[in-house]
Amino acid sequence: QRQMCIRDREKAREEEPWPLAKNTLDLLWSNLSAAKEKDLPICQDTGMACVFVELGTDVHIDGSFEAAIHEGVRRGYTDGYLRKSIVADPLRRGNTGDNTPAAITVHLVDGEGCRITVAPKGFGSENMSRIQMLKPADGVEGFKRFVVDTVKQAGSNPCPPIVLGIGVGGSFDKVAYLAKKALLRPLDVPNPDPYYAALEQELLSAINELGIGPQGFGGKTTCLGLAIE
């Protein structure tokens, strides 16, 4: 994803008419290059470790699988000197000191393999998440209005240019999972359904017409890509 962000950033700079937006993209590019060279995060907010597991039904694991994942997160954040943001209780606010627990989602699949994807999710973007229970009569137009309005309300808070994950359908908890899962899809891979692939492009254009721009300084580069699941 990082390489695709680099490529899309270069394309965005070429197409960006606003000088301040171009300059901001250059600064973001310099930061990304420095992070790659020094093996450091591009932002101090290294967020929560969201772990997606595809676990084969023929896999047998001795011991606690979740405990092993938490230990991996603990070591990664400690050895990598990443900021510890996670609290043991959301209201009493005591920091766990090692960024655990992780948010773990397990999806059972056929076979005897196990695939683990770790996606650190910064809270600057996480806090901009929204959910809406649309009425059937709202239709696709209501869906599009909600998506564009969500980005408009968020403004500069998620540090644009953003990558947007959108979940649609299912229950309250399922749609949030779909939105997270959508962020794992490579930026250059459209939805396999032509209807949703076209909708992704339509929404991308509408969002970039909002004029929020890089870091909220204006311009047409508000969103590098989005995925609907």
Predicted features along the sequence, with ranges:
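Catalytic or ion-translocation cores adjacent to nucleophile or general acid/base/metal-coordination motifs
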Residues: 174-210
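Short, small-residue-biased leader/transition segments that mark boundaries at the very start
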Residues: 2-6
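Flexible, glycine/charged-enriched surface loops at secondary-structure junctions
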Residues: 7-9, 20-25, 39, 79-93, ...
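N-terminal low-complexity or amphipathic/hydrophobic leaders
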Residues: 7-55
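Conserved phosphate/anionic-ligand binding catalytic regions in large, soluble enzymes, centered on
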Residues: 38-57, 158-175
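C-terminal edge-of-domain segments
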Residues: 108-110, 115-117, 219-229
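Conserved mixed alpha/beta catalytic, RNA-binding, or beta-rich assembly cores of soluble enzyme
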Residues: 113-189
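A generic, well-ordered mixed alpha/beta core segment in the N-terminal half of proteins
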Residues: 47-110
